[in-house]
Regions:
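Alpha/beta hydrolase fold serine-hydrolase catalytic domain that processes acyl esters and thioesters
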Residues: 2-80, 84-89, 93-123, 127-135, ...
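Gly/Ala-rich beta-loop-alpha elbow adjacent to hydrolase catalytic centers
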Residues: 139-144, 148
Length: 347
């Protein structure tokens, strides 16, 4: 929820009680449960208000609800710090929102080694640690899980030592395996939990650990399972699965195959094309695209047609290899060679 509309982005301001912030935000939204853009359905608002009735959440406080939204470079960064009654400091990073810039930054994870949100996450975590004493929990969902992991790995040693738990909820991996071979990663591993649904798509992107815990979702496809509200609960426990489905294994291998197969010039071409296409829509968010679908599609097509010839030829090369990759990956999963292929990739 957009608590940044209620809570200051400064660590120097007084923390705001969770119940007060939630009531104010609900009132700001007309005292009605409404979706937040096209992605977050109205159930997120319903859950927020239900939480205000439970003792577990009532005494929490919020501080430094930060929202950074920029273009060139594309940045969509959101973070908030929750202060628990026992003194624990919970630093939460939000995933991708409704904005097209946010989605572009997601694509940047695939084509660039560094994105602005990585440094923003590291700096934010260090500020929270400097301001408050106590154990620290770091967590996030989707891109939020990705930057939570990055911030926890690359913050100062004295901050890492205070981290009690690091939770990555179906967030993607890094651009290469060197990140998870660092001493920082090995140091953090006993505190680290990576949760993914059984047919995970986002959580299988790029180079990630294989120590993830598989969660049972009510849905049956990766993108739909990415919604945390579909993850099943039994009492106070999350329902686990013994492993990924074949679809989840396919997603893991094919996404790494596609991205790892790109050279630097191909990544640059893909980046230029995505930037041109998204700018061409003339829209700010996904809801705007939905409401102005005809104009958005026309703008996108027009912008894509204007992409230079060399870039278009490079895009054709990229997608020409896609069929082969899909076929070989599907065959590997069918033959039960998932672990063998994964070991080969890591080498």
């Amino acid at each position: 929820m957009p608590y940044e509309k209620i809570v200051s982005d400064s660590f120097d301001d007084m923390p705001t009680p969770f119940t007060y912030a939630s009531d104010r935000l609900f009132a700001l939204r007309g005292n009605k449960h409404k979706p937040v853009g096209l992605i977050l359905l109205k159930n997120i608002s319903e859950q927020m208000m239900l939480m205000t009735n439970y003792k577990r959440y009532k005494e929490m406080k919020l501080v430094a609800c930060t929202n950074v939204f920029e273009k060139k470079p594309d940045v969509q960064f959101n973070a908030c710090t929750f202060l628990l009654p026992d003194g624990t400091v919970v630093v939460v990073f939000r995933g991708t929102d409704d904005s097209l810039r946010g989605w572009k930054e997601d694509f940047d994870i695939l084509t660039q080694d560094n994105i602005p949100s990585q440094k923003l996450a590291t700096d934010y975590l260090e500020q929270a640690a400097q301001k408050f004493d106590g154990d620290i929990i770091v967590c996030g969902h989707s891109k939020g899980g990705y930057v939570a992991q990055y911030g926890a790995l690359f913050c100062k040693k004295e901050v890492r030592d205070r981290i009690k738990c690091l939770y990555n909820n179906d967030g993607p991996g890094f651009s290469d395996y060197s990140f998870i071979e660092t001493e920082n990663y090995k140091e953090m591993l006993p505190k680290y939990k990576h949760f993914v649904p059984q047919s995970s798509f986002i959580g299988m992107l790029l180079c990630h650990d294989d120590d993830y815990e598989v969660i049972k979702s009510k849905r049956i496809t990766g993108p739909l399972e990415h919604d945390l509200s579909t993850w099943q609960i039994s009492g106070d426990e999350i329902k686990r699965e013994s492993g990924l489905t074949d679809m989840g294994k396919f997603n893991d291998l094919i996404m790494y195959h596609i991205v790892d197969g790109l050279d630097e010039s191909q990544k640059a071409a893909l980046d230029r094309a995505l930037t041109a296409d998204l700018d061409g829509t003339g829209q700010v968010g996904l809801l705007d695209v939905k409401d102005n679908a005809i104009a958005a599609v026309k703008g996108l097509v027009s912008a894509h047609d204007k992409i230079d010839k060399a870039t278009q030829n490079t895009l054709k090369e990229i997608f020409a290899d896609l069929d082969k990759g899909i076929a070989s990956t599907a065959q590997a999963v069918r033959k039960g060679e998932f672990k063998t292929v994964k070991q080969r990739i890591k080498k």
